[in-house]
Structures are given as structure tokens and as C-alpha cells.
């Protein structure tokens, strides 16, 4: 089945120099994603828009968050099939990405994709975010400038899984659906508890003539 955007000039316009790497990623997930439980059967012909371009929508916000920061470190929580972590890493080769994922079969997939895409800026950790949070608290690893995620959990839970990973003045950048504003309205207490402030929703461009997505941004005190 051919992807609806295959060969479209939109891909080069949005993805730029990352396109060759992401074409290899697209081919792999189009062939293996459904049987390996990474995408649904109805996604096979819309992988570019629903998964890759949707993930790339966070790239300008990550760049903005790390502007002027020497160590541009990004943690991607619940990386799953590589959305948004692998896509963002391909688009931002000057940033160091740590993909955090608890499931072994998804860890295997991520390692395969990192090799296929020849990404030199990605580290993969098998584990839950709370284990990595403990490493940050014990100063075994440095906190991150940015934490990203997509379709992991509602903000009431996500706040505690992500905000403690951030350095002061860092940012959580989370891809969300249409209920994003309702989620942050409901999670005000949890956001504040874990050091977050100024939660807001932005409408992020996916590509020309494509439906935009929603991104939640939370600053770390």
C-alpha cells in the first residue's frame, strides 16, 4: 500500500536534510510496523502525515527551548516506535537524545532503526521514566534541557513522569490531541507539584495543507 504523501514535495520542505534518513525509517515501519505492533492497520498509508510529520512538528519548539544552551540534551519518554524521538533526532543532529522505553521488543526496534538511520546522537535506555528520575536525583546522570513525548499518558500522570527529568528552565514539549487544553486545566495541581509553570497549548504546523497538531509546553522552575 502506497503512502498518501510518498514522493510529495512537502516531505523535503518540512524535513530538509533529515529526509533520506526518514525515508529509510518510513520504509522499515511501512513493512514491519503493523506486524510488530507499532502502528495500526489503518495507519499504513498515512505514516508520513500521522506519525513522521506529526512528530517533526515539535522540532521548532525544541530548537527554541535549547537556543543558547551549550549542552542540548533531550529525553524522549515512552519512545515506542520512535515517535517523536527518532524523528526529532534525525532533524536535530546537533542535539543529544536519550530515548526511554520500558518494553524489550520496542528497545530492539529502536536499536535497529538507529543503526539503519545512522544516527550518531541517540542513546537508548530500557526502563521506566521513574528509574531515570532516580538517577537524576542521585546525580548519576544530568537533568535534561528538554523532555519530549507523544501519546504516553494524560497530563495528570505525565507531569510526574517528565518534569523531574528537567533542569531548571528546561521545557516539557508533549504532542497531544484536541483535548490538550482540558488536560492541562485538570492537571494544574500535578504540574505545580513537580516544578512546572506556565503550561500552555500551541497549535503546531505539520505541513502545508495538512491539519495542524497540538503541543503542550510546560516550563520547569
Swiss-Prot record:
<keyword id="KW-0489">Methyltransferase</keyword>
<dbReference type="Pfam" id="PF02527">
    <property type="entry name" value="GidB"/>
</dbReference>
<dbReference type="GO" id="GO:0070043">
    <property type="term" value="F:rRNA (guanine-N7-)-methyltransferase activity"/>
</dbReference>
<keyword id="KW-0698">rRNA processing</keyword>
<keyword id="KW-0949">S-adenosyl-L-methionine</keyword>
<feature type="binding site">
    <location>
        <position position="78"/>
    </location>
    <ligand>
        <name>S-adenosyl-L-methionine</name>
    </ligand>
</feature>
<feature type="binding site">
    <location>
        <position position="150"/>
    </location>
    <ligand>
        <name>S-adenosyl-L-methionine</name>
    </ligand>
</feature>
<feature type="binding site">
    <location>
        <position position="83"/>
    </location>
    <ligand>
        <name>S-adenosyl-L-methionine</name>
    </ligand>
</feature>
<comment type="function">
    <text>Specifically methylates the N7 position of a guanine in 16S rRNA.</text>
</comment>
<keyword id="KW-0808">Transferase</keyword>
<comment type="similarity">
    <text>Belongs to the methyltransferase superfamily. RNA methyltransferase RsmG family.</text>
</comment>
<keyword id="KW-0963">Cytoplasm</keyword>
<protein>
    <recommendedName>
        <fullName>Ribosomal RNA small subunit methyltransferase G</fullName>
        <ecNumber>2.1.1.-</ecNumber>
    </recommendedName>
</protein>
<dbReference type="InterPro" id="IPR029063">
    <property type="entry name" value="SAM-dependent_MTases_sf"/>
</dbReference>
<dbReference type="InterPro" id="IPR003682">
    <property type="entry name" value="rRNA_ssu_MeTfrase_G"/>
</dbReference>
<dbReference type="GO" id="GO:0005829">
    <property type="term" value="C:cytosol"/>
</dbReference>
Amino acid at each position: 500500500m502506497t503512502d498518501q504523501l510518498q514522493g510529495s514535495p512537502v516531505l523535503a520542505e518540512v524535513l530538509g536534510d533529515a529526509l533520506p534518513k526518514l525515508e529509510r525509517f518510513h520504509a522499515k515501519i511501512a513493512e514491519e510496523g503493523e506486524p510488530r505492533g507499532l502502528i495500526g492497520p489503518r495507519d499504513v498509508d498515512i505514516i508520513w502525515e500521522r506519525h513522521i510529520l506529526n512528530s517533526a512538528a515539535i522540532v521548532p519548539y525544541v530548537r527554541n527551548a535549547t537556543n543558547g544552551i551549550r549542552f542540548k540534551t533531550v529525553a524522549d519518554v515512552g519512545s515506542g516506535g520512535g515517535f517523536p524521538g527518532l524523528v526529532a533526532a534525525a532533524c536535530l543532529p546537533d542535539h543529544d537524545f536519550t530515548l526511554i522505553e520500558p518494553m524489550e521488543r520496542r528497545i530492539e526496534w529502536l536499536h535497529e532503526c538507529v543503526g539503519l538511520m545512522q544516527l550518531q546522537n541517540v542513546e537508548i535506555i530500557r526502563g521506566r521514566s521513574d528509574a531515570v528520575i532516580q538517577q537524576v536525583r542521585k546525580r548519576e546522570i544530568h537533568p535534561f534541557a528538554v523532555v519530549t513525548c507523544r501519546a504516553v499518558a494524560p497530563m495528570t500522570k505525565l507531569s510526574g513522569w517528565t518534569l523531574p527529568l528537567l533542569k531548571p528552565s528546561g521545557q516539557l514539549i508533549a504532542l497531544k490531541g484536541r483535548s490538550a487544553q482540558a488536560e492541562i486545566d485538570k492537571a494544574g495541581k500535578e504540574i505545580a507539584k513537580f516544578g512546572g509553570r506556565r503550561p500552555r497549548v500551541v497549535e503546531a504546523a505539520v505541513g502545508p495543507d495538512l491539519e495542524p497538531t497540538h503541543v503542550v509546553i510546560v516550563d520547569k522552575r
